[in-house]
């Protein structure tokens, strides 16, 4: 498969779980725990997909979603929001800002992998 996925998640256990399971599926995985680190990774790499948590220590993942989708160089990168926020309003805002899918925690790794494959 060999697609490069960026995981933006501040919980180390979730990040490691995603790295492991996505790696087993043949994806290359880069992961960061903050928006600051995410900006650097996005600017210096080509990603096939971004998995984005909304609640990060240095801001909202929604801001990053808006920036990625508003930049001509990165607007085509699919974004799947992966968050504990399950209110309908949060989902609608995520989709309005350009997210391609929205998955709430706790999540099924198998289902997430199928969603990733559908979006890529």
Language-model features, listed with the residues they occupy:
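N-terminal/domain-start alpha-helical segments
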Residues: 1-120
